[in-house]
Amino acid sequence: GGVRFTDFHSGAPSCSPSRATFLTGRHHYRAGVYSVITERLHKMHLLESETTIAEALKENGYATAHFGKWHLGMPVNNRKNPTPADHGFDYWFGLVNGPGPSHKNPTQFLRNGKRVGQIKGYSCQIVVDEALTWLNEKRDDDEPFFLNLWFNEPHAPIAAPDEIVSQ
């Protein structure tokens, strides 16, 4: 059983606004995200007043988890921006923006708000492994779930295992 969403149309031509539209189902301006979020330049973030799909599903008994790039504002640089937990995700493993310094052996991942430190491997594989661990070990098998997974790889600098690149 369940529902598989297979036909999403981007709400904007860039990263952060599209993510805001995906989570809220509303125009990104209304959700508070009007351009790509550059943490050093402004405090823009997904407004806490917006209801996300994760919040709606959580209220209806779903386990919710986010994996990968968030890029909707985070409490970095002493800011009080909301985290994925503030938008309905029970569990999250992700990035404020990029994996830094590269997709290989990244250092910027957070797990439920706590820095993880350097992880060996490539960010795409790390995110999938974490999501699979959550699916197989951390969630209640009898509970419906919503898993949101956003890869960082569409953004430079691109790095991937040689066996994938060679294909």
What would you call each of these model-derived segments?
Residues 1-167:
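Formylglycine-dependent sulfatase
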